[in-house]
Amino acid sequence: MFSNYLLSLAIWIPIAAGVLVLATGKDSRAPLARVLAFMGALAGFLVTLPLFTGFDRLSGGYQFTEFHEWIPLLKINYALGVDGISVLFIILNAFITLLVVLAGWEVIQKRPAQYMAAFLIMSGLINGAFAAQDAILFYVFFEGMLIPLYLIIGVWGGPRRVYASVKLFLYTLMGSLLMLVAMVYLYYQTGSFSIVDFQNIKQIPLGVQQLLFAAFFLSFAVKVPMFPVHTWLPDAHVEAPTGGSMVLAAITLKLGAYGFLRFILPIMPDAARYFAPVIIVLSLIAVIYIGMVALVQTDMKKLVAYSSISHMGFVTLGMFLFVNGQLNDWALKGAIVQMISHGFVSAAMFMCIGVMYDRLHTRNIADYGGVVNVMPKFAAFMMLFGMANAGLPATSGFVGEFMVIMGAVKVNFWVGALAAMTLIYGASYTLWMYKRVIFGAIHNLHVAEMKDINCREFAILAILAVAVLGMGLYPQAFIEVVHQAANDLIAHVAQSKI
């Protein structure tokens, strides 16, 4: 019985839990709010596990589908479904949300109930965006999740939190207005807002495809974010609380890349081929130039934020590598796998920075040094996650990058060579930060007073370490889920609509 409503449960359990936590009200009831938030996040995660275990890896199309009329007059429906791509993102989102609730357990003292509730509600809305099969439903969830994210940064962020949250909101909202117009145009072509109907339009002139591409691309490129519309992300990360940075990097950025897979590539394949060289150049700029920018950062959060832009450039590169008019198999699957890996690794890196910030209240690299002498367990975890961020073999960070490089070399040797620069820059800025923060002599008396990670922090980092190593050592568990959906997308994009 419940299997018919798993996606609805994955959406509405976190939202309902968030409302319940919000109802606890005053800070004096913070212990109750934390327990309810944990139970809600745990229930939200557990309900996604049957999606993974029950997913038919050999079957194409959408599974766990639901359909209910919402606004019949406009043919807007509550339609849900997942394929091998979206199912992984829903599970990742629920997983990270659970860890974020634990990460803020003792740290957030100001309005903890509202803080936890914002994350739970945002988690449900993000799941809705990944599961939506109706364009307007997708738009509602896609834009709705901005509200709790705006509040998380604007209320619990750093000194410049208002500036960062407004910048985030304006960038992402303005980019989405044209997408709504494009959806209305597609509605008039199909007679419905069904995303599947959009994808199955037989004929769209190239000029129209290019206009639609521009409308959708602006919205999704800002969310990824791609160069040059990336400037909101470092500010948002620096000002966001630890949990906000974890979700922003691990989940929110993936919504933009997911939009490329769900809308741009299948609906506008000819325009995607036409603009692919431009996307490849912008992606390589993100990989190389933004990697160089990360090298000169003095703030740990800002360094990892630029690292995220560089890694997401790798993702968009993999999505737009065409060979003889067809998407490259290795590169596309590698891009999807890289997104899942980046979810684990980026969340872990921001958690590590948060652990140090909670003790020393600074993110300046120069204020640290010799941390390994007082926090050896923490230093070991940060080394693992740093190496995964650099793409070390046997970690999750290597798998997707290697697959994209394989696909890039098949398209053009020099594109592959330039893409491989991410491994060099990733190692450079990660080791540069690690050496100055973790190794060396203690020259700050406050560092000497730092305590090693507690049981709660150890549990969070250990869970993320298992995910990073598990995916690195046995990536097939993830690749086999993605395989059929990626093949279906490749076959669909190969058919011209001119």
Q: Where do the protein language model's features map onto the residues?
A:
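Alpha-helical transmembrane segments of multipass membrane proteins
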Residues: G18-A23, L49, L98-L102, G124-G128, ...
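Structural signature of hydrophobic alpha-helical transmembrane segments
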Residues: F2-I13, V82-N93, A135-P148, Q209-V222, ...
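Alpha-helical multi-pass transmembrane bundles of energy-transducing inner-membrane proteins
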Residues: D27-L32, A117-I121, L125-V208, V293-Y306, ...
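Transmembrane helix-loop-helix hairpins at membrane boundaries of multipass inner-membrane proteins
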Residues: M1-L6, L20-A117, S192-N200, N487-D488
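Central hydrophobic cores of alpha-helical transmembrane segments in multi-pass inner-membrane proteins
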Residues: S8-T24, F38-L51, L92-G104, M122-G124, ...
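C-terminal ends of transmembrane helices
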Residues: V19-D27, T97-Q109, L151-R160, V224-V238, ...
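Predominantly late transmembrane helices and immediately cytosolic-facing juxtamembrane segments
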Residues: F227, S346-F350, G416-E449
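Juxtamembrane/interfacial segments at transmembrane-helix boundaries in multi-pass membrane proteins
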Residues: F55-N77, S176-T231, D235, F260-V278, ...
